Amino acid sequence: MKVVILDTGCANLSSVTYAIRKLGYQPEISQETATILAADKLLLPGVGTASAAMDQLKQRELIPLIKVLSQPVLGICLGMQLFAATSEESDNVAGNNVTLLEVMASPVQKMATHGLPLPHMGWNQVLPKAGHPLFRGIEDHAYFYFVHSYAIPLNTYTIAQTEYGNIFSSAIAKDNFFGVQFHPERSGAAGARLLKNFLEM
């Protein structure tokens, strides 16, 4: 099976690559159209700000390509947020919302934590919707590792939720696009199982 990690220019790819290799796969890191289209499974990791990430995707001419992918794609952390429509996380002085990949019509918003510190960093519990294959064999309220200050609110595509001040989407799914706000590659056995589930879909 051909597993490709999209080289977005805005992610630490080594930890994701290592986690996939530990599961017995040989992932390829690429931004080439032919390689991406030939993949059986794709991963879209991301760190940093939404506006910087979209700038990188635009420079690499990946935006139209990602939107038309038909194979399963897993967005990780910022990679999940990029599937939304807009983000409040802007680099510009005007503070305008950033247009994202618009795979789903949901915003990314700064977390309302009711006094809890940002970023939301560390281990927190994830409650998946019953029966979703991405969480097969993973206990309800399993702990995963988070680092973020922005989140997607609960919506039609939410398949798991987490509470930090407010409840937010910790995993989403729409058609062939899946996303997790946490870092499965840094989440021990539960994270490894989630990656395994995705790769075996």
Curated annotation (Swiss-Prot):
EC number: 4.3.2.10, 3.5.1.2
CDD domains: GATase1_IGP_Synthase
Gene3D superfamilies hit by this protein: 3.40.50.880
Keyword Acyltransferase: no
Catalytic center residues: 77 (nucleophile), 183, 185
Residues annotated as domain Glutamine amidotransferase type-1: 2-201
GO molecular function: glutaminase activity; imidazoleglycerol-phosphate synthase activity; lyase activity
GO BP terms in the entry: L-histidine biosynthetic process
Pathway this chain belongs to: Amino-acid biosynthesis; L-histidine biosynthesis; L-histidine from 5-phospho-alpha-D-ribose 1-diphosphate: step 5/9
Cellular-component GO terms for this entry: cytoplasm
Keywords: Amino-acid biosynthesis, Cytoplasm, Glutamine amidotransferase, Histidine biosynthesis, Hydrolase, Lyase
Keyword Cytoplasm attributed: yes
Subcellular location: Cytoplasm
InterPro entries per the UniProt record, alphabetical: Class_I_gatase-like, GATASE, Imidazole-glycPsynth_HisH
Catalytic activity entry: 5-[(5-phospho-1-deoxy-D-ribulos-1-ylimino)methylamino]-1-(5-phospho-beta-D-ribosyl)imidazole-4-carboxamide + L-glutamine = D-erythro-1-(imidazol-4-yl)glycerol 3-phosphate + 5-amino-1-(5-phospho-beta-D-ribosyl)imidazole-4-carboxamide + L-glutamate + H(+); L-glutamine + H2O = L-glutamate + NH4(+)
Known role: IGPS catalyzes the conversion of PRFAR and glutamine to IGP, AICAR and glutamate. The HisH subunit catalyzes the hydrolysis of glutamine to glutamate and ammonia as part of the synthesis of IGP and AICAR. The resulting ammonia molecule is channeled to the active site of HisF.
Assembly, per entry: Heterodimer of HisH and HisF.
Protein name: Imidazole glycerol phosphate synthase subunit HisH
Name of the coding gene: hisH
